[in-house]
Every structure is written in C-alpha cells, then in structure tokens.
C-alpha cells in the first residue's frame, strides 16, 4: 500500500489493479482493512480505528482512493462527492484511437445488475441514466492511445462503457470489448488525479497517482 496524502481528517492511497476497496463476497482482504491496520500500527492505537469509505474503484482499476479518518470528514466528503466538488481525472489506455482527438460523450446508460455490466444508448430508455464525460488524447504509441477523461456524471462502469460504445475499449477490459486481457487481470484505467477543497482546513488538495509499473504505462504515461 502506498500512502500519497494524509492528515488528521483523511488519507489518500494508491490502489493496485485487482485490489478491492470494501469487503465483498470474494473474502479477499479489502484495501480499507489494510489502511486501518496501517493507521493502527503507525499511531500505536490499541482499539479499533475509524475509517470511512468515501468512494470506490472497480476491482480491475488502479489509482487514487480517498478514505475519511473521522465521521465528520466522512459526512463532508460524501456531500462533496454528491455535489460534484471533488474533481477526479482518469487516464485510460485504449486499443483504438478515437475518431476525434477531443470530445464530450453523452449517452444513456442502463445497468444490468445480474451481469454487473452497463449498456449505452443514444437516447433515453426505461431505467437509463444520462451519462456525460469529456476525453482528450494526450499520447499515442504505434498500437495504443492514452486518453485523459473527466466525468460530468458518476455512473456504473461509465468510462468503460462509454469508451467501448465509441469503439475504443480500454486495454484489457474483456467485459467491454477489449480483444485480450492484461497479464495482471486488471484493465488499463487509472484514477490519476484528485483535486478538491479540504472539508475542514479549506485548503486546495491536489494529489496525482504514480503510474502502474508495467512497461506500457511507463512508456505512454511519462509525458
């Protein structure tokens, strides 16, 4: 686990592809528990440690995760997420270059709970939710393209689904049309940067994620 920012109210850590943020049916140790144990050891606390999950990343996604260290910070950060006051920027490596180097995508997404998958439509349909993101090309190699993605809405698998719908699936994302998986089982989607006004101190917090260690990320992401 890599800690990238910490104060008395919150902690921001790097999640590797394959890790889960919260406990689920898999029985794997979640990142939240790893962070709790790290805090407990660091501050030599004999009892339980409070840690609030503010948001999640899909298991195959890597990058920044914010946790609250107090109940007050958790409430405020939850409200900030709800009001769009925490700005998250993603980097995605896609297997085909998009038709336009920069664009805003608007789709209507329907979530299929049984399949754990979302489907995109170009018009409103029953149970669909309007989904908007903006992307721009920031680097390319012979075979892959690196996009910077900003979400205007927060839907289930939104980036994965909308990019796939433009015939630009994320590298390794078999569920959304990538031709093959990544060796580590993850997908090439990185929660790269978060920026927000601190819920208590009111200072501007800006944190960037390190790049995943694989060779493609190191080659295409060092810009």
State where each predicted segment sits.
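RNA pseudouridine synthases
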Residues: 1-223
